[in-house]
């Protein structure tokens, strides 16, 4: 197709990070406007409606200010990434394409610290392990960062050292929380 995006790494399509990534950006915008029209028809039976053109971004990558990333063991190593589309197979990633690059850096730093402190990633099959997900938010204007460790239980061995180390690397981190799930 002449509207195919040739620049996108296939890993992003396989992970579902960039569902429309196979389309050139102007075609993505047209697709989204058509989705609105189709939804109005499907939900409300409205057919005679003008839908304005979808407004695009100057740079349609590296814009998301929040990431929720699963933590799993892949080939014996603790990894962060995204699940392969329609599965629970983790695809290790360091560059998440649509996320703020600083968020990607914080996730990689946390991954490395989790490895260093030998904290166990969650294993769905065995229903065991400690760390399920990492959630990182970054203020677009303030640059402040929030980190949330999603764990299976309240106690996290050496969590104080882990927090101290990640804040040393990223002084913009202003809050660290734990979500027990």
PLM regions and their residue ranges:
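Accessory RNA-recognition modules of RNA-modification enzymes
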Residues: 1-181
């Amino acid at each position: 197709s002449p509207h195919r995006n040739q620049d996108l790494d296939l890993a992003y399509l396989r992970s579902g990070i960039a569902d429309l990534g196979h389309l050139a950006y102007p075609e993505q915008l047209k697709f989204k406007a058509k989705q609105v029209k189709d939804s109005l028809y499907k939900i409300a039976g409205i057919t005679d409606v003008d839908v304005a053109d979808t407004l695009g971004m100057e740079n349609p990558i590296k814009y998301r200010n929040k990431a929720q990333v699963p933590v799993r063991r892949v080939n014996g190593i603790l990894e962060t990434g995204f699940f392969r589309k329609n599965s629970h197979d983790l695809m290790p990633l360091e560059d998440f394409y649509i996320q703020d690059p600083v968020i990607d850096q914080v996730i990689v730093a946390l991954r490395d610290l989790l490895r260093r402190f030998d904290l166990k990633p969650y294993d769905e099959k065995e229903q065991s392990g400690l760390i399920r997900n990492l959630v990182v938010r970054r203020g677009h204007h303030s640059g402040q960062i929030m980190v949330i460790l999603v764990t299976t239980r309240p106690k996290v061995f050496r969590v104080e050292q882990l927090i101290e180390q990640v804040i040393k690397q990223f002084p913009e981190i202003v809050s660290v929380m734990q979500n027990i799930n």
